[in-house]
């Protein structure tokens, strides 16, 4: 048995090959993440007598090139959580941190955990694209939130409270009524310098041009509030430029978010489990693809507990002797993006309260018992994942083999 420990970094890796009882087959050496170096590594591993297993840490995206290419070469590859490697065999007072030492430590981990190593599965291209899109979607959502807060902060100095005038959702192109309104009426003087009738006519024409619903009572309300507001920044070309730039940045982020949302739904619709997932309560055209992106192929989970462990919503245990803690926090060692999506699904269930849904019934029961918010939300996410696992796995098993 040969343990190949690979300490992965960006563009290069350190490799060490060991056998039981500390026998060094190959001292740590460096390889580049190029086709020639990876091919040479495959030939070296195949030339070593006996079964070989490769272990590396799944850090960021760095490891994926090696893991993918070595798996395609029919080698046993296992990608391990970096925390497990870090906590392994810390029985020395001396702290040594180098790529060579890390590769040897990973090889020793492979020997110690030989029987428990799980083989790395190459994700198919469609799921990989969907997951990448979801990560981009989350990134641009954060950008959109930052741009929105930035615009509101500027408008508070020219037209305080204008962002609260309309609550209509974003359109398919990402545009929002309050943003478009603030782009046109960027300063309170843009409204109150006109007469009431003139503003109503102007606002009505604006609604018609932008294809928004017009309400005369709303126009009168806006005009009345404008009379009482006190701006800080003057109504001049510099202030207008600042606001226009902030609006353009927000609209750009919003457009990207909505285009990604649409593309993710189109991509997810090609997955076999799409109809089952989309039929679940609390899941729609936005959250459904996000769930499928983060969970991936359900068949890789051996049981229901494995999928809740993966999400980090599994209940913790703290027992010692006669002591048994009643309420233990969840591990939160899994995918934070998946937990966020699950909480959004739970939030939809609470707002829509479908009485025939078992997850909502469970959440409602926990709320009635007086459980704290995070307790019943996490418990609901756990139950939702178990149902998700059961329904999807049953459906996939019923499909004819391709």
Model-derived features: positions:
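A detector of single, family-specific signature residues
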Residues: 1-402
């Amino acid at each position: 048995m040969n343990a190949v420990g690979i300490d992965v970094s960006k563009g290069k890796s350190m490799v060490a090959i060991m056998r039981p009882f500390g026998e060094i087959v190959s001292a740590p050496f460096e390889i580049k993440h190029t086709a020639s170096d990876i091919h040479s590594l495959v030939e070296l591993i195949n030339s070593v007598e006996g079964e070989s297993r490769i272990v590396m840490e799944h850090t960021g995206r760095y490891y994926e090139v090696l893991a993918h290419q070595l798996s395609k070469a029919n080698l046993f590859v296992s990608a391990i959580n970096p925390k497990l490697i870090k906590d392994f065999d810390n029985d020395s007072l001396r702290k040594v941190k180098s790529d060579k030492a890390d590769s040897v430590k990973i090889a020793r981990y492979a020997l110690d955990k030989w029987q428990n190593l799980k083989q790395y599965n190459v994700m198919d291209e469609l799921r990989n694209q969907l997951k990448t899109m979801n990560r981009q979607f989350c990134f641009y959502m954060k950008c959109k939130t930052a741009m929105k807060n930035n615009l509101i902060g500027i408008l508070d100095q020219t037209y305080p409270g204008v962002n609260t005038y309309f609550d209509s959702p974003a359109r398919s192109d990402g545009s929002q009524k309050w943003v478009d309104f603030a782009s046109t009426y960027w300063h309170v003087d843009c409204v109150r310098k006109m007469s009431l009738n003139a503003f109503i006519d102007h606002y009505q024409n604006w609604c018609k041009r932008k294809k928004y619903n017009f309400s005369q009572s709303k126009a009168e309300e806006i005009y009345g509030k404008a009379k009482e507001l006190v701006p800080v920044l003057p109504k001049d070309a510099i202030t207008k430029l600042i606001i226009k730039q902030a609006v353009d940045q927000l609209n750009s982020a919003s457009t990207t978010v909505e285009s990604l949302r649409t593309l993710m739904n189109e991509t997810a619709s090609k997955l076999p489990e799409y109809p089952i997932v989309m039929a679940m309560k609390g899941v729609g055209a936005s959250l459904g693809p996000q769930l499928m992106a983060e969970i991936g192929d359900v068949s890789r989970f051996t049981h229901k507990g494995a999928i809740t462990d993966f999400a980090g919503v599994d209940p913790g245990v703290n027992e010692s002797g006669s002591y048994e803690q009643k309420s233990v926090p969840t591990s939160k060692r899994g995918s934070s993006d998946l937990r966020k999506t699950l909480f959004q699904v739970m939030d939809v269930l609470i707002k829509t309260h479908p009485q025939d849904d078992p997850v909502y019934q469970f959440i409602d029961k926990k709320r009635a018992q007086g459980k704290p918010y995070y307790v019943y939300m996490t418990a609901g996410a756990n139950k939702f994942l178990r149902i998700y696992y059961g329904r999807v796995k049953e459906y996939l098993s019923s499909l004819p083999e391709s």
